[in-house]
Every structure is written in structure tokens, then in C-alpha cells.
């Protein structure tokens, strides 16, 4: 029996010449065309925001830019994906990567924020922050500055049945630690 996912995904791309290619997902063949358009528009907007962020941060010429994506969850009426943009500027010490994630409730037809995953009034920021602090201690992760708490709009995605909280490069750790 073939596996059936809530949404079908195809890969699209745009290129700006040699060494500048952005791959991004497009949702297809959904019964709810309004939701399909909303998801695809959200993906394009976030992909463009990543490009804009990379170009705006450095006054030097972009030598290389690669955009990619990962589908983190496509089951149980939840679509969660991560968009990645790596850019290297001329004469930079190294390239920079940013990741942005989008999570959609396919039943309600909504884009989910971290807050949406918890009951109203719950102290999710403190609880998640405590878990992260414990993991930092257990893994002996070197921090740039002391970690106090996540932000209400903290980056996250859903992978299978797990909530994954992540930080951008340099947010809390040196570059070498990655995401």
C-alpha cells in the first residue's frame, strides 16, 4: 500500500547565475486551494526574507548563495518545514547560514506560532527555557552569553511528534557549535 501524506511537495528553484541558486518547496494538489495558496505564499515570502537578510547584512558582493529546505513533518495534519539560506560574501572569513521554519495546522488552515502549540495562559516560555538550560548544562555547551530564556517567537519546528527549538548562529553559541 503506498504511503499517503497530507500534502504533496514539489521542488522549485530560482537562480541568479553561477553559484546562486535557491531551492524551495511548493505544496501541490491540496483540496483546499485557499490553504494551498496561503502555504505557498508564506514559503515564498519567508524565502525572500532570508535572501534579503543575507544581502542587507554585508556591504560586499555575494559570491555564493544556496537556499534549500527540509520537510520536518508531513503527517497528522501538520506540515512543518525549514528553509535554509547559506551565503558567502567576497572576502568574508566564512559564509553565514540562517534557518527559518514554518509550521501549518492543515485542519484549521493556520500558520502556527510557538505560542499556538500551548494552552492559553500556560507558562510555556519558562518551562521550555528550563529544559533548554538543563540541556546546555548536560551537554556542556559553551555559550557566548548566559542563556536566560527563549523568546515568545522563538524559532522552532515539529519533527515527527517532537518540538524542536533552535537558535540562529551566534544567538547563544559560537559559530563552531552550529544550530
Question: What residues fall within each predicted segment?
Answer:
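Compositionally biased intrinsically disordered regions enriched in Thr/Gly
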Residues: 1-179
Amino acid at each position: 500500500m503506498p504511503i499517503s501524506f497530507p500534502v504533496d511537495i514539489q521542488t522549485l528553484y530560482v537562480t541568479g547565475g553561477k553559484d546562486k541558486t535557491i531551492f524551495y518547496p511548493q505544496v501541490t494538489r491540496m483540496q483546499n486551494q485557499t490553504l494551498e495558496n496561503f502555504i505557498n505564499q508564506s514559503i515564498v515570502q519567508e524565502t525572500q526574507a532570508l535572501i534579503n537578510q543575507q544581502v542587507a547584512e554585508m556591504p560586499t558582493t555575494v559570491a555564493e548563495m544556496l537556499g534549500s529546505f527540509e520537510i520536518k513533518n508531513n503527517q497528522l495534519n501538520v506540515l512543518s518545514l525549514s528553509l535554509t539560506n547559506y551565503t558567502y560574501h567576497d572576502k568574508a572569513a566564512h559564509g553565514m547560514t540562517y534557518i527559518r521554519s514554518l509550521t501549518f495546522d492543515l485542519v484549521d488552515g493556520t500558520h502556527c506560532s510557538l505560542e499556538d502549540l500551548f494552552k492559553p495562559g500556560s507558562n510555556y516560555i519558562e518551562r521550555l527555557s528550563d529544559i533548554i538550560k538543563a540541556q546546555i548544562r548536560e551537554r556542556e555547551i559553551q555559550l557566548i552569553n548566559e542563556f536566560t530564556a527563549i523568546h515568545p517567537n522563538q524559532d522552532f519546528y515539529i519533527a515527527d511528534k517532537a518540538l524542536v527549538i533552535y537558535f540562529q548562529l551566534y544567538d547563544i553559541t559560537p559559530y563552531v557549535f552550529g544550530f
